[in-house]
Amino acid sequence: MGRGKIVIRRIDNSTSRQVTFSKRRSGLLKKAKELSILCDAEVGVIIFSSTGKLYDYASNSSMKTIIERYNRVKEEQHQLLNHASEIKFWQREVASLQQQLQYLQECHRKLVGEELSGMNANDLQNLEDQLVTSLKGVRLKKDQLMTNEIRELNRKGQIIQKENHELQNIVDIMRKENIKLQKKVHGRTNAIEGNSSVDPISNGTTTYAPPQLQLIQLQPAPREKSIRLGLQLS
């Protein structure tokens, strides 16, 4: 009779568990060594017991070299997988966008009245309903835009009207100030003209005009006459 099938589960008995670990560990390390020799493979095995004891095997090199190679190759494979996954993702995106573009192009051609030969009465009625709905939406949007523009124009008109009113007030103030200045200037001019038109001074019945002064420029005497006068005085 053959050996019965062993159930793979944790061994409860600690002694049996330790014996089984020792036997199978030795067998695993032996198989790893045989694999590296027979197949010229680089093999690294790391085992930790339940108590934390380390057992390892490295073929033809150190365990550090095998781990470094493992990490390097694992990273390369990860990058390749990511790159391949990214390519597949974008391929699916391109296919989906192409389908959407084709559908939108067909809808556009139908909306503009092209390629209607393959449509029945129901399809045409649905297309008409879509056009009516779209037209209502367009009109509603247009009315909304026009209403907004009218409100904006009214607002700007009110601002301009307010600015004009303020400017008119400033002009009125400046006009009043100008009138005041003109009155002051005319008053001073009239006063000056009145003073200059007063009658000459009167003394009883005789009127005396104010004397007019005239500057007389002295002329130098001739040289001979000066000499004579000098002799007479001497």
UniProtKB/Swiss-Prot annotation:
SMART domains: MADS. SUPFAM superfamilies: SRF-like. GO terms for molecular function: DNA-binding transcription factor activity; protein dimerization activity; RNA polymerase II transcription regulatory region sequence-specific DNA binding; transcription cis-regulatory region binding. Keywords: Developmental protein, DNA-binding, Nucleus, Transcription, Transcription regulation. It comes from the Eukaryota. It is found in: Nucleus. Specifically expressed in roots, mostly in lateral roots (LR) primordia, young emerging LRs, apex and base of LRs, apex of the primary root, and in the stele. Barely detectable in shoots. Residues 1-61 form the MADS-box domain. GO terms for biological process: cellular response to nitrate; lateral root development; positive regulation of transcription by RNA polymerase II; response to nitrate; response to nutrient. One of its GO terms (cellular component) is nucleus. Probable transcription factor. Required for root plasticity in response to nitrate, NO(3)(-). Promotes lateral root growth in a NRT1.1-dependent manner. Interacts with AGL16, AGL21 and SOC1. This is MADS-box transcription factor ANR1. It comes from Arabidopsis thaliana.
